[in-house]
Amino acid sequence: MSRYRGPRLRIVRRLGDLPGLTRKSARRAYPPGQHGQNRKKRSEYAIRLEEKQKLRFNYGLTEKQLLRYVRKARRVTGSTGQVLLQLLEMRLDNTVFRLGIAPTIPAARQLVNHGHVTVNGRVVNIASYQCRPGEVIAVRDRAQSRKLVEANLQYPGLANLPSHLEFDKNKLVGKVNSVIEREWVALQVNELLVVEYYSRQA
């Protein structure tokens, strides 16, 4: 299944607020489509599926990529759900988004893919790169890159910088101080239901 490129507000209406996908809010509080206002009781499977979809759309992943992250999280000691969120939050595209360099994760991915971001002084154009504590994330020192990011900083996606990051707006340089804590994950999601969804596949 490929990465979603359709109308973003349609997804927000179905799944709720997805801060990584779009800054816009849905005007209508019910899902899209002819039967959007139906109030049928949902099955447990449908609830788990919805939580999984929140992760997939918020972080802009394909089904295969998300399954790979779940399998990776299972191999790490600790809560699988929490490790899964940490893996997704520490991706380079998400880190760029959380630093305020880009208004959304898709916009951050584009900055990374086009070579506007450096890690420890070297250009990294892989959005899935896992950022580690101690690494310095910066905007590439060239006019085009700085102009793009300075425009983005006028309208940051999220107001608060998470505690594991620091950012110098004048130098356009950020640093990863630690792995993100669960309380700083902006997406409202029940990660345990996501793990349950994949329990027979991962």
Curated annotation (Swiss-Prot):
Annotated Gene Ontology cellular component terms: small ribosomal subunit
InterPro entries for this protein: Ribosomal_uS4, Ribosomal_uS4_bac-type, Ribosomal_uS4_CS, Ribosomal_uS4_N, S4_RNA-bd, S4_RNA-bd_sf
Record-annotated S4 RNA-binding domain positions: 90-152
Pfam families in the cross-refs: Ribosomal_S4, S4
Keywords: Ribonucleoprotein, Ribosomal protein, RNA-binding, rRNA-binding
GO biological process: ribosomal small subunit biogenesis; translation
Region described as Disordered: spans on this chain: 22-43
A single GO molecular function term of this UniProt record: structural constituent of ribosome
Signal peptide: none
PANTHER family the record matches: 30S 40S RIBOSOMAL PROTEIN (PTHR11831), SMALL RIBOSOMAL SUBUNIT PROTEIN US4M (PTHR11831:SF4)
Entry-linked NCBIfam families: PRK05327.1 (NF003717), rpsD_bact (TIGR01017)
Family of the protein in this entry: Belongs to the universal ribosomal protein uS4 family.
Protein role: One of the primary rRNA binding proteins, it binds directly to 16S rRNA where it nucleates assembly of the body of the 30S subunit.
Subunit record text: Part of the 30S ribosomal subunit. Contacts protein S5. The interaction surface between S4 and S5 is involved in control of translational fidelity.
Protein name as it appears in the record: Small ribosomal subunit protein uS4
